[in-house]
């Protein structure tokens, strides 16, 4: 008996369907493991997947068996060691689910946990599951949809510029074999017979001439089969796929004042790294505006936003004023979905907190889809938090605020802020 052993590592993705079915079946286990991994890892450590363990008892297939009801008459052998109601001790060592600790035993059976690895893409999929930018709507629609061109297979008709040379030559080769296959076989036999006659019967001129004529006739028939026919032409088929024309921008406002300790700044940076990762993975096209502020605010690039060491006093309104100016200049609200995320320790110049409230209520909140504020402090809230609470009362659907105490709070708070909401 012959055996064919496929040693390819998931060649041609042939077991992808089975893997996706497995991931759906044990989604709860995987999601719990991902949440634990996020709280354990650094937010920047997302370049690889995660090892998932599933208890052996949870991967058992359901079986049909006889119930415990009914009346049975059974004779059991007696024993001198156990009586009714006693519990049998758990075997030492090799029992299933053991963590590798304890002494070895000479008895006991069980099943270890099932351990497998999920990829980075699968890890991020579970990490950002059920998250979205709230209130994302289409902007600047004038009755025409936008489209993107995507590959949709092979067609027998199309633009010469889109001809698929490999598929065309393959089709032509198959056609030539089909049309001239029998003639080639006869030609091969005729040549072999001619060679035999010339070798064994060189004086048999009649048969030799007849075979030479047959060979010439078969060769002419084969050459009449065209190398390329219009039937062989294959073209790459491109179709237009509707593309939602939503345009979105996210403003990231980070406090880098002197009151922000290095630990507090690190938590703020981790929050924005998680937000940036979420945006770039879930949305193809979205603008991100980075603003750092102390007594003054500046728009910076991604590198400077996360790694600059500049610091100073605290005037939060400077960042809000700059955001409003950029909105008015580059992101009109009738064309753009505008979002903002602000992180601070809540320490602000007292006279500035009411100014922040007025700017938000009158110049920013009426034009944004969603505004989030996270306050990173283990202490009691200060004036800025209470001013923002008044904003949350006025804009309950589009304003949210949360408190962060430690790095372990980042992911739960992030999920709370961007949890997918039911559309009513």
From Swiss-Prot:
HAMAP family xref list: UPF0229
Chain intervals with Gly residues compositional bias: 92-108
Pfam family, one: DUF444
Record protein name field: UPF0229 protein PFL_5654
Chain intervals for the UniProt region annotation (Disordered): 85-108
UniProt cross-references to InterPro entries, sorted A to Z: UPF0229, vWFA_dom_sf
Species in which this protein is naturally found: Pseudomonas fluorescens (strain ATCC BAA-477 / NRRL B-23932 / Pf-5)
Entries under PANTHER family matching the protein: UPF0229 PROTEIN YEAH
Protein family (similarity comment): Belongs to the UPF0229 family.
């Amino acid at each position: 008996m012959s055996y064919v052993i496929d040693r390819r590592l998931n060649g041609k993705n042939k077991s992808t369907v089975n893997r996706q079915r497995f991931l759906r079946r044990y989604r709860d286990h995987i999601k719990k493991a991902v949440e634990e991994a996020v709280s354990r890892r650094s937010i920047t450590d997302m370049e690889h997947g995660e090892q998932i363990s599933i208890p052996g008892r949870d991967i058992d297939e359901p079986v049909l068996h006889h119930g415990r009801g009914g009346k049975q008459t059974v004779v059991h052998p007696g024993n001198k060691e156990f009586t009714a109601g006693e519990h049998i001790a758990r075997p030492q060592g090799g029992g299933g689910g053991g963590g590798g600790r304890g002494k070895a035993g000479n008895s006991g059976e069980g099943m270890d946990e099932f351990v497998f690895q999920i990829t980075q893409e699968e890890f991020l999929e579970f990490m950002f599951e059920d998250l979205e930018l709230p209130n994302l709507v289409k902007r600047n629609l004038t009755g025409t949809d936008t489209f993107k061109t995507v590959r949709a297979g092979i067609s027998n008709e199309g633009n010469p510029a889109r001809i698929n040379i490999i598929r065309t030559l393959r089709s032509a080769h198959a056609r030539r074999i089909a049309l001239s296959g029998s003639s080639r076989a006869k030609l091969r036999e005729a040549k072999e017979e001619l060679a035999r006659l010339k070798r064994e019967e060189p004086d048999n001129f009649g048969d030799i001439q007849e075979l030479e004529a047959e060979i010439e006739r078969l060769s002419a028939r084969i050459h009449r089969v065209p190398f390329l026919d219009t039937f062989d032409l294959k073209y790459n088929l491109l179709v237009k796929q509707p593309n939602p024309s939503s345009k979105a921008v996210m403003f990231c406002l980070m406090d880098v004042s002197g009151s922000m300790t290095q630990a507090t700044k690190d938590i703020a940076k981790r929050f924005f790294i998680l937000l940036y990762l979420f945006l770039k993975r879930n949305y193809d096209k979205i603008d991100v505006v980075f603003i750092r502020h102390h007594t003054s605010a500046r728009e910076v690039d991604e590198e400077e936003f996360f790694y600059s060491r500049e610091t100073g006093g605290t005037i939060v309104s400077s960042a809000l004023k700059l955001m409003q100016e950029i909105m008015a200049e580059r992101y009109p609200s009738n064309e753009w979905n505008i979002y903002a995320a602000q992180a601070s320790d809540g320490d602000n110049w007292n006279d500035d907190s009411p100014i922040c409230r007025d700017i938000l209520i009158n110049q920013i909140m009426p034009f944004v889809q969603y505004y989030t504020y996270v306050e990173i402090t283990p202490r009691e809230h200060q004036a800025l938090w209470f001013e923002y609470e008044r904003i949350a009362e006025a804009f309950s659907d589009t304003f949210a605020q949360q408190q962060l105490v430690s790095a372990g709070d980042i992911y739960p708070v992030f999920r709370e802020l961007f949890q997918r909401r039911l559309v009513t």
